[in-house]
Amino acid sequence: MLLPATMSDKPDMAEIEKFDKSKLKKTETQEKNPLPSKETIEQEKQAGES
């Protein structure tokens, strides 16, 4: 079975060049699981030792 020329592994540069970034919406990224600060880690270590 022959695949049409449009189904290639190489990106279509014309398609990329006509992509309009202004159509993208700006979203605020929110960390779902923020890492604990060094202070929090130290407090937890000390709490675990006592």
Curated annotation (Swiss-Prot):
UniProt modified residues of type N6-acetyllysine:
10, 18, 32, 38, 45
Gene Ontology molecular-function annotations: actin monomer binding
- Which SMART domains does the record match to this protein? THY
Q: Where is this cross-link: Glycyl lysine isopeptide (Lys-Gly) (interchain with G-Cter in SUMO2)?
A: 18
InterPro entries reported for this sequence: Beta-thymosin, Beta-thymosin_sf
Gene Ontology CC entries for this record? cytoskeleton; cytosol; nucleus
Q: Which residues carry this modification: Phosphothreonine?
A: 29, 40
Tissue-level expression reads: Originally found in thymus but it is widely distributed in many tissues.
Basic and acidic residues bias spans:
9-31, 39-50
Give a single Pfam family match: Thymosin
Where Phosphoserine occurs, the residues are 8, 37
Instruction: State its location(s).
Output: Cytoplasm, Cytoskeleton
What keywords are assigned to this protein? Acetylation, Actin-binding, Cytoplasm, Cytoskeleton, Isopeptide bond, Phosphoprotein, Ubl conjugation
Which biological process annotations from GO are given for this protein? actin filament organization; positive regulation of DNA-templated transcription; positive regulation of smooth muscle cell differentiation; positive regulation of smooth muscle cell migration; regulation of cell migration
Location of region: Disordered: 1-50
Task: Please describe the quaternary structure of this protein.
Answer: Identified in a complex composed of ACTA1, COBL, GSN AND TMSB4X. Interacts with SERPINB1.
According to its UniProt entry, what is the function of this protein?
Plays an important role in the organization of the cytoskeleton. Binds to and sequesters actin monomers (G actin) and therefore inhibits actin polymerization.
Family, according to the entry, reads as follows:
Belongs to the thymosin beta family.
Name recorded for this polypeptide: Thymosin beta-4
